[in-house]
A protein has these predicted regions:
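Sec-dependent N-terminal signal peptides
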Residues: 4-15
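Hydrophobic ligand-binding cavity/cleft-lining segments
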Residues: 19-64
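Amphipathic hydrophobic-ligand
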Residues: 23, 109-116
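Hydrophobic/aromatic beta-strand elements that line small-molecule binding cavities or substrate pockets
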Residues: 29-31, 84-90, 114-121
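Stable alpha-helical elements in mature extracytoplasmic
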Residues: 36-37, 43-46, 84, 148, ...
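Glycine-rich portal/gate segments that line the openings of hydrophobic small-molecule binding cavities
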Residues: 52, 61-107, 165-170
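A conserved amphipathic terminal alpha-helix motif
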Residues: 128, 134-170
């Protein structure tokens, strides 16, 4: 009887924590841009500047911190949509990369989101951007894992393609 009660309590605890049991998902997008690495880095390096090149965001405002210092918090506002906060985790100007996380809870179908963004030398005359993240599906069953990954990849693709078009036309 005691084993049955312990077993039932264990199952109840596991069932009541579905988000914790979900595995991490990964999204990634890359793009090659035919401009110098310095021009690309200059366009993307400011933690509070995503809305200047990503058309999905209408505003990007620093709440605390600043000057690309780890711990800086920004509020992102989706065009005609919700707002959510992100924290800068690391910033390396020399290697042209930074990482950040979405502060949970956020009005998005994800949780535990951590992302890295890096600008590197590409093939001759090109610069490559690498945008990667890991996260959990937090859509309450409304989206399959593949759909959530597609949602994030599509957001990356829209931003990177807009950046490419803008920089290559200057």
């Amino acid at each position: 009887m005691k084993k049955a009660i312990v077993g039932a309590l264990y199952l109840l605890c596991v069932a009541s924590q579905p988000a914790a049991a979900q595995s991490l998902l990964n999204a990634h997008e890359t793009i090659d841009i035919k401009v110098s690495i310095w021009k690309v880095w200059d366009a993307v390096k400011d933690f509070d500047g995503l809305n200047t090149w990503h058309p999905m965001f209408s505003d990007d405002e620093i709440k605390s911190g600043g000057d690309n210092e780890p711990g800086t918090i920004r509020t992102m506002t989706v065009k005609d949509g919700p707002s959510f906060d992100e924290e800068l985790l690391s910033f390396d100007a020399l290697d042209k990369k930074f990482s950040y996380r979405v502060i949970d809870p956020a009005p998005l179908p994800i949780s535990d989101y951590v992302s890295s963004f890096q600008v590197i030398e590409g093939r001759r005359g090109y610069t490559t951007i690498l945008w990667n993240s890991s996260f959990r599906n937090n859509s309450d069953g409304k989206m399959k894992d593949e759909e959530v990954i597609g949602f994030i990849n599509n957001a990356y693709k829209i931003g990177l393609e807009n950046l490419k078009t803008t920089l290559e036309s200057q």
